[in-house]
Amino acid sequence: MGDVDKWIEDVKKCKYLPENELKKLCEMVCDILLEETNILPVSTPVTVCGDIHGQFYDLEQLFRTGGQVPHTNYIFMGDFVDRGYYSLETFTRLLTLKARYPSRITLLRGNHETRQITKVYGFFDECFSKYGNANGWKYCCKVFDLLTIAAIIDEEVLCVHGGLSPEIITLDQIRTIDRNGEIPYKGAFCDLVWSDPEDMEYWGQSPRGAGWLFGHNVTKDFMAINNLNLICRAHQLVNEGIKYMFDGKLVTVWSAPNYCYRCGNVAAILSFETAEKRQTKIFLAVPDAERVIPKQNTTPYFL
């Protein structure tokens, strides 16, 4: 663990690893992820987090708010990269923690953890500008391919990046998805990372062009069939950091404060003492005086 401990200390300072060391780290994490099921069982206490999007200094604020790993257990519900200034450092920070404390931190796949999306929204360009080639991005994409789809807390609370799918009736259908690879353009896997809840009864077409809008009755039926008490998801900016829907049965958690350095929103994490007993913790963006803003950002970060 000597290498990993050194990496943890280096990356805490918002430094990225040399290319050969990133390769080694990604290979270590891939070996861990290969052992994880599509729905990873997690026990309380645990803290659930939403999108981070490369906002490294705000991720550090999240850890100050919720507690450091390994003293606090975490589930991060995807979208670690793109749009923020420090996607590489942010993802590397989470990977070092996963390598060192694999049972203390769960990393779920978001819709941004794909080759296609990261080529458009900043992560590819950032890796290329920092390493001078695409190798670092390729190593990270191999990790993306293996990130688990969902987590279930105490067999009662389902955590997933986006939402539900008309092709998924039971949790066992999620367990049988072949997740090792790019997320398809349509189908169950795609829906789980792209769908959004909407104030409606059943299913609707998503304006995102991927996934679905899913309503109250759909959610209620899915939860009854699978003996769930709550669904946690991320994927949508919430100005208050957290938003409950469907009679409190579904919650959106957003963990990137002042999203894209301009939205003015607060962020939240959801701390579960037990599956029933939980506490929302709100935090603000780190002041500009306490963060380093790159002199040149070649990729538009708000698209």
Curated annotation (Swiss-Prot):
Pfam families, sorted: Metallophos
Entry keywords, A to Z: Cytoplasm, Hydrolase, Manganese, Metal-binding, Protein phosphatase
GO biological process: G1/S transition of mitotic cell cycle; mitotic cell cycle; negative regulation of JNK cascade
Sites where the protein binds Mn(2+) 2: 79, 111, 161, 235
GO MF annotations, alphabetized: metal ion binding; protein serine/threonine phosphatase activity
Family the entry assigns: Belongs to the PPP phosphatase family. PP-6 (PP-V) subfamily.
Protein name: Serine/threonine-protein phosphatase 6 catalytic subunit
Organism for this UniProt entry: Drosophila melanogaster (Fruit fly)
